[in-house]
Amino acid sequence: NGHKLDEASQAMSKLQIKIRSLRDISPSISVVEPQGEDCAHVARSKIMQVLHLVEHKLNGNWLMVEDSGLFVDALGGFPGVYSSYVHSTVGIEGIVKLLEGKEDTSASYISSIAFWDGERIHSVQGHCKGRISPESRGDAGFGYDPIFIPEEGDGRTFSEMNLREKTSLSHRTMALKKMVEKLNFPSI
């Protein structure tokens, strides 16, 4: 996902770490989207699929796989691990419609990163709490960004923020910070 790559690159740029797509290493690689109970399971399953295919091509570089989802409290955590599928079928309008008449619109974005450091696979998770806007707002970002208002923000949706602003608050950046700590890099 190019948008995820942009966010990760923005977050890691301070450390002068270049993030590349798996397609740069192996253009024809195909990963089966696993069904799992949480994002951590999905990310771990994906990295295990990929690692045996590209380990010989990594040349000392580490490998990371990220899976994320939007978990809406009033919907029992839905769409959760099915966020991508739900977005492609009912869209953000479908989520807004499901929340009509509900007072509680709290939600969390969760990002799970599985990464291989050259010796073993590690897992980390980042969270961004917020709420769902009753309408789509903004043109930037992707996925559910037009309806997600982060708790730590100023009332704008992720889509109303530029990439730097969004990255400073995002679940993905929180997970990347934890990954950087495990790899003993300076903080991002």
Question: What are these regions, as identified by a protein language model?
Answer:
Residues 2-188:
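Anionic-ligand binding patches
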